[in-house]
């Protein structure tokens, strides 16, 4: 069994052990108050994978890190996984946007090979133009296609197949334009849309300049609102909690709950601009707490959470890096090195592998994504 000690206060202390996995099934946790009282340990079953499923090892496979009333239990037999990528059907949506003066113009839309034309006179308005275009598109009777009108735009969505669409309008041809899953510049986005509408902003051909904008409707449904940074709709939202270290929480006197941690989801970017932490696809060897960050070591990498957000290993913005963002570094050495333990010191983090040791630190003692380095 893996034994551990928890000291809540001078008068509330506990001794616990993680019992090894039997021939079948999973391990278990027993805890006693130092006064001899047997404690209640509840195994959480509210998630898709029960918490006890994480207890697959023996005493050599577990590491326990206790911070206040929570103990983080790491099993180095478990390979960390990300949540599955969602199903994303490209070009199933399209947005027609009006710009410029609506007076005395001709507007043309081609939807799935069907051409629609609408002309305005001196009394033309955005509302009359969009109403006419919507009526004409709806009259095509395309199966699965729905059209929604906003103040300066029409949104098309097809539940069956991709949409083929083009549009022109005005004397220069740019008073009516259309986009689907991406735009060249953020200024092309309409002022109204539906809640959680995600559009890729290209900016340039470089991947690092690309980001995703998500529409936040004021009423949580559609209409007026604002655009904020969002996540690539084709990529995973974050960590698979069933494969990550679990928490043992002291919920009351002599009562504990063992459960998955509510890891913060990835909210912005994609795998290029806001990648998963380096321990995804690897086995975590141990956890540590330093500089108001929770950290894990896996293979030759050290990953640390957002500052003061211990369960968040993702950046808050894909466009800029802040000092509070996660830190994720690899040990530089000519020999393979697997970090197996970590010792916090006043100078930094002392990292131990089987044959070498390293120091992770910064010049001013505060670890940040841009100022932290690892040296032998």
Give a label for each model feature.
Residues 22-24, 79, 301-303:
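Short glycine/acidic-enriched loop and turn motifs that connect beta-strands
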Residues 18-19, 74, 297, 352:
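Residue-level marker for isolated small/hydroxyl-bearing positions within beta-strands
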Residues 225, 231, 237-265:
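C-terminal globular interaction/adhesion domains in large, modular proteins
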Residues 261-292, 297-376:
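Beta-propeller and closely related beta-pinwheel folds
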Residues 4, 11-69, 75, 95-169, ...:
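Extended, beta-strand-rich, solvent-exposed assembly scaffolds of outer structural proteins
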Residues 3, 64-65, 287, 342:
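Hydrophobic core register within WD40 beta-propeller blades
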Residues 85-87:
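Post-signal-peptide, soluble extracytosolic/periplasmic N-terminal scaffold domains
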Residues 27-53, 77, 249-271, 321-326:
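Acidic/polar, low-complexity linker and loop regions
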